[in-house]
């Protein structure tokens, strides 16, 4: 069974914004490296959906996994499948942005 994930439109937009911001501050190499780090975290969560910490106090059924300066918020939606809901910077207000 292969691990799979879906990115919500908001999560996809966050990844694009993260790339743009990183590129503006540190250049293309760092932007590409950081996105690879985030992608690796998504792949890890997809391969082992329970790796992230449950955060039912935020949203029932959600899990979170830190990656660099960001946190992935996702739900386990089926056998071997996760839905990445948001990718938020650690400084962002989680309640407001979920």
Curated annotation (Swiss-Prot):
Pfam families associated with the record: ParE_toxin (PF05016)
Q: Which UniProt keywords apply?
A: Toxin-antitoxin system
NAD as a keyword?
no
What's a single GO BP term from this record? symbiont-mediated perturbation of host process
Which InterPro entries does UniProt cross-reference here?
Answer: ParE1/4, RelE/ParE_toxin, RelE/ParE_toxin_dom_sf, TA_system_RelE-like_toxin
Physiological role = Toxic component of a type II toxin-antitoxin (TA) system. Upon expression in E.coli inhibits cell growth and colony formation. Its toxic effect is neutralized by coexpression with cognate antitoxin ParD1.
- Database matches in PANTHER family: TOXIN PARE1 (PTHR33755:SF9), TOXIN PARE1-RELATED (PTHR33755)
Which protein family is it in? Belongs to the RelE toxin family.
What name does this protein carry?
Toxin ParE1
**What organism, scientifically named, is this protein from?**
Mycobacterium tuberculosis (strain ATCC 25618 / H37Rv)
């Amino acid at each position: 069974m292969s691990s799979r994930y879906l990115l919500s439109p908001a999560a996809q937009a966050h990844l694009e914004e993260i790339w743009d911001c990183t590129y503006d501050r540190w250049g293309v190499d760092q932007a590409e490296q950081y996105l690879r780090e985030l992608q690796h975290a998504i792949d890890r969560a997809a391969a082992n959906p329970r790796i992230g910490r449950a955060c039912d106090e935020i949203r029932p059924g959600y899990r979170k996994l830190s990656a660099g300066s960001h946190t992935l918020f996702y739900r386990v939606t089926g056998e071997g499948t996760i839905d990445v809901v948001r990718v938020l910077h650690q400084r962002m207000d989680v309640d407001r942005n979920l």
